Amino acid sequence: MKNSFVELKARERVNALLDTPTGRELVGPFDQMTAPNLIAQGIVPESDDGIIVSRGTICNKEVVVIAMEGSFQGGGIGEVSGAKIIAALTHALTENQNGNEIFPIIVLDTGGVRLQEANYGLLSISEIGNLIVALKKYVPVIGVVPGRVGSFGGMSITSALMSYLITTKKARVGLNGPEVIEQEAGVREFDSSDKDLIWNTIGARQRVEAQIIDELVTDSVENVKAAIVAAMVERKDSHRSENADFYLSLLAKLDLSKPMAIEDYNQALAKHQTQAVELPVVTEQATPATASVGYDWFQALTGLKNPSSTISTVYYGDSDRFSEDAVVTTIVPDSKNPMYRVRDGEVGLVEGFRMAQILNHIYEEDQNKTVKRPIVVVIDVPSQAYGYNEELIGIHVALANSAAAYAKLRQAGHPVIGVVVGNAISGAFLAHGLQSSRLIALNSDAITVQAMSKASASRITKRSIAEIEAAAEKVPSIAYDIRNYNKLGALYRFLDGVTDQTTTTDNVATVIEAVNDAIEDVRHTSDTMLTNRYTNDIAVKMGRVETNKVQVKMNEEWDA
């Protein structure tokens, strides 16, 4: 009888995969790296914070295996747990850059962001994704989703960034959990009590049909290990996060104004071949094309008068308003959009894939230039799209394409400067903003930065909204306002004096000056990664203290 992989705990899964006796756990339970943010909320922590990291070999190939414990906080990512993954992948990247091949294997059993640490989770997931994009230049990054919790939220965006994804039939993979979709969009959009609907939409068998999972294996340690070995030896890579034209040309053929039948989608997908898709065109018009904070700031930072895009929700344009010629990007609402779940500015399928297409075009244009153009990201995104069609097709893949394209540009030498002028929420922020080299934010009460709406967070964490608000007074990372967000060290520049979102002459001048400073800082430091987020003064002294403690521990133990 073969040994079940699904039934094992995270540490057992890691040990089962590694060659005996090569496994060596790093920053383990005896290091007592617990999550102080959980303790502050009266939540019992774990001494390993639900993440197991071990170095060793699999079939004599050097690996670092990272596994999430789904039974602790739903496998959610907070500051300490995220920092362990970031530190391990950082070392793996350095090893590969130095010619020492080491394969990252990531076992996902996670609901995504740990809502009790919210913004720490979003920051960590963006930094993990950045490292995966960098690592794939050297080795395949292999993901495994055994089952139990499955893979949801921002970590599903991460799964789509990986080279190759292996699951058992007990796994589910999606961005928005069924309960969250029901909370945000209503039971008619997705009935979270309908188990057949859930498994037929996001279950592993359907995910293979939908080309979201690469390999489905029968549940056993031996089968999972064999699939991992084959992926390493054959250097398998589905390039799922570099597939914008494929999906854009597919979406153009589908009627997404109503829920699609699963079989109809599978047939359309199976028949589809990639076709070239024209880039959006942005022109000036006599009247505004839409109304939003992001639209106003795009107009102000490009100098375009009443810009209108052939893709109504996705905008980009050249700008000479900064110290260097730049490209400005944004995502805006369209109240008449046939894809009804993105009418208020949410980031959906088209938005993710279109932004990736635009960014990849910029990458190609500047590939042979010594100096790469800055990208100025105007951030005003209320959330990702919560919808049945979005989950069926794989909205997390769309968001991964956008995130990967931003990361690719930054790693190639483009300063990517994010300007938070409106809301910056959840997967939308991961796709459009959190891969920025530097973040700048207005000091406006109207800005919300978070992983989930209060209503959904209340339902998932089983706490009242009043309890969530009370906890936020102790733990800045779960607050919803931009001033608490600034305490985390994530912002390069917090514009105290810009207390409203309007594009007055003074406000625009202040933002342009801050963007110019950020571009200069990136150029001066030759910074192509995201380490500035946790090495700046605010982060070191207050915002990312635990992140830096984990980094020190990992440095001590990596080669010990």
Please state what every model-predicted region is.
Residues 1-29, 33, 183-309, 462-560:
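Amphipathic alpha-helical segments at domain termini/boundaries
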Residues 43-60, 309-324:
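N-terminal short beta-loop-beta anion/metal-coordinating cradle
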Residues 49, 77-100, 345-369:
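A short, well-ordered alpha-helical element
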Residues 58-83, 322-353:
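STAS-typified acidic loop motif
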Residues 65, 103-107, 142-144, 166, ...:
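Structural motif
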Residues 92-106, 129, 133-137, 371-374, ...:
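Glycine/small-residue-rich phosphate/adenosyl-binding loop
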Residues 99-117, 371-392:
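Short, glycine-/small-residue-enriched flexible loop/hinge segments at domain edges that mediate gating
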Residues 112-241, 387-506:
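Conserved catalytic cores of soluble enzyme domains
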